[in-house]
Amino acid sequence: MLALSPATRDGCDGASEFLDTSCGFTIINPEEEEEFPDFADHGDLLDIIDFDDIFGVAGDVLPDLEIDPEILSGDFSNHMNASSTITTTSDKTDSQGETTKGSSGKGEEVVSKRDDVAAETVTYDGDSDRKRKYSSSASSKNNRISNNEGKRKVKVDWTPELHRRFVEAVEQLGVDKAVPSRILELMGVHCLTRHNVASHLQKYRSHRKHLLAREAEAANWTRKRHIYGVDTGANLNGRTKNGWLAPAPTLGFPPPPPVAVAPPPVHHHHFRPLHVWGHPTVDQSIMPHVWPKHLPPPSTAMPNPPFWVSDSPYWHPMHNGTTPYLPTVATRFRAPPVAGIPHALPPHHTMYKPNLGFGGARPPVDLHPSKESVDAAIGDVLTRPWLPLPLGLNPPAVDGVMTELHRHGVSEVPPTASCA
């Protein structure tokens, strides 16, 4: 059985064009040599094929076609060569197929690399465009900032000389009638603008207004003090020296005593002044001569009142506390006995417990011992030299002893046992 299969290929325009024609022979039963003779023994294949049998059409129906056999034989040989080339290419070994696949993979890699390069080029182009836009926006922003800085007013440093000239111009024109343009003309300063002068004039008026208000308030207080106050300090018409009304006396209570003004402190030459941090201290050698010998003043604290000692468990004296939420009332006399209520009878004598806490009288401490006590301590040391010295006594220095001996006329001192 002879099968002819034309191969078609689609072009770019979508139309199918016949590029080549391949003829293949399929042998159904190769053992039957009678049905399929060898075509190689016969000459030309076209001479053997009967086209009338193939198409099944009578010869008188078809028109007479005169075809040059040489053309047909040449075209058919070309088609056979092309089909054999295609068949040989399709029947390559596995290794050749793998090589072809590798080559096709390389081609795909090359194509992919080209695509990547193209994409990177596009990306670079986009980045460059973005950078151009960013640079243009940054330059425009810088230009805008520079223009704004140029439009801003330069801050003026108002020196004392400049402020003095400003005040002179304002006083000449009047504080309420002064205008920035006239002040600028009178000052004659070229570095100032009308805006600078107007701002400084506003601040000057506000500050001057506050100063005038404070001066008026101080003058008002001074006037009231002179009207209602008395320089001698006496209470006149119920008013004190500072102008305030004295408190009226309460009904049923005596008037409050006048407040005594403390006299100025009297400085005596024999009292030590109060030491202030940072001032030089007084020499300690003259301290015994500075401080006079005196006793501490007696305490003015009153002792606790006596209480009755009783064995009754019903009554307990309260020493340091009182009943909460009740006023403290001093009981001077004992309450009379009531029938039915046991009362503790006082003993024949009362017990007074002195308060040894704070405020009680203590024996005076002699800060400066007398000469007799000092002589007694020295005599005790001389009689018992093996005992340690009492507190406050230090052994004399050798230089001091020698000086004292020379002062008394002793010039020669026998050597001690250690020196011998």
UniProtKB/Swiss-Prot annotation:
Biased composition (Low complexity): 135-147
Induction of expression: By light. Repressed by BZR2.
UniProt tissue specificity: Expressed in rosette and cauline leaves. Expressed at low levels in cotyledons and shoots.
BP GO terms, sorted: negative regulation of leaf senescence; positive regulation of DNA-templated transcription
Cell compartment(s), UniProt: Nucleus
Main location: nucleus
Summary of subunit composition and partner proteins: Interacts with NAC92.
Name assigned to this protein: Transcription activator GLK1
Organism: Arabidopsis thaliana
Underlying gene: GLK1
